[in-house]
């Protein structure tokens, strides 16, 4: 308990330190067009909160980015299971996954604009960024399954459902959870970056671009804070729901 309290105090102290550095830097620069103070950024955010357009932009971007994440998560699990079952599938997918991981996000965004509209761009980019991360995580989990337990399950001819609960899910889910934690952050960053280039109306990326061209640095910082907050909140909510689902599936609920 004391350790947890000390850890929280340390985090708050670190946050306070960097806010003080930010405030000092803003005062040293002395021009809000280049760097606003944290107080001014917060003030701008509070001005945005009552506006219907603010929430409309959040709903638009969040819906598409999370759709891309969901599609990427489902596809990665299906492909990873297929790769674990058939070696030729893994051989086919290996160069594709490596290519997706190595290609800059900006290149994908520009190329994707040829194929899809600006409003769908963030879905596709989020999907592409999530896919190799979760594919690798699930493959790692599958590879860590206990070989002896698998042999025993084969000998005793355990049904698929029992094998999933007793062997495969305990091996895969920790790696999948860790992969989701990484992938959620990536999909938010890449999704908003896609919106900044694709400029779909009523999106967060469009708001960032407008703030940049009008030199509204306060809005730029306010929207950046919103993106960080949304990413953190959705990550915590998703991981909490995933943990509850895992506990239920593995029969650990209430333990």
Give names to the regions the model predicted.
Residues 98-133, 140:
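Generic hydrophobic transmembrane alpha-helix motif, especially the helices
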